[in-house]
Amino acid sequence: MEGKIVIVTGASHGIGLATVNLLLAAGASVFGVDLAPTPPSVTSEKFKFLQLNICDKDAPAKIVLGSKDAFGSDRIDALLNVAGISDYFQTALTFEDDVWDSVIDVNLAAQVRLMREVLKVMKVQKSGSIVNVVSKLALSGACGGVAYVASKHALLGVTKNTAWMFKDDGIRCNAVAPGSTDTNIRNTTDATKIDYDAFTRAMPVIGVHCNLQTGEGMMSPEPAAQAIFFLASDLSKGMNGVVIPVDNAWSVI
């Protein structure tokens, strides 16, 4: 990734921040985006940051222009869509309209709008890698809320469609599907909105794959970040339209 220009959403914490650190260590120039402030732990001159809401309709244009201004180049070698929010385990019976709308907007619509803007650049340069962070729940349906599951299934579909549609333009599009990971999503959940009946039914399964029995707990963000880095780089040059689970074997059951 030496000399590459990479855009990372959700860059202030969790998997996004872990990915930023890997990219910078490999010599990439990274344009980070997040609703939260710039991560104070990142001090590299190769890291530039834009704080905004990716759901704003003008956000994609601002992000692409911001990267161009920051690094003095029209190139975008990789787009890593890491940002995401949860839905409090609300089911098809209990979901609230505002929660549904927010989750679909952040986890799907905003990601696809940014892809559209970045694809304009990648199509001209005839190269580029897009990595979308979906979830173990993109590979199944249980153990999550209906909006979150729907958004991640849809984003995986977008990933596969984009991979095929733009393969002849030198553009790859792949996905990483993390399992239970210790990220900021868990720390910012509004407990008053949780569907505790659904949550209670899911916990026995979630607990096994969070390693609660061993006391090890959730995975750190680094394993998912390493998979994202791999798919963004030329190490995965022959891979297009794939999804890599990083979930302690959860997706095999």
Curated annotation (Swiss-Prot):
It is a single-pass membrane protein. SUPFAM superfamilies: NAD(P)-binding Rossmann-fold domains. GO terms for cellular component: membrane. Pathway: Secondary metabolite biosynthesis; terpenoid biosynthesis. NADP(+) binds at V8, R116, Y148, K152, N184. The active site is at Y148 (proton acceptor), K152 (lowers pka of active site tyr). It comes from the Eukaryota. One of its GO terms (biological process) is terpenoid biosynthetic process. This is Short chain dehydrogenase ple7. Belongs to the short-chain dehydrogenases/reductases (SDR) family. Keywords: Glycoprotein, Membrane, NADP, Oxidoreductase, Transmembrane, Transmembrane helix.
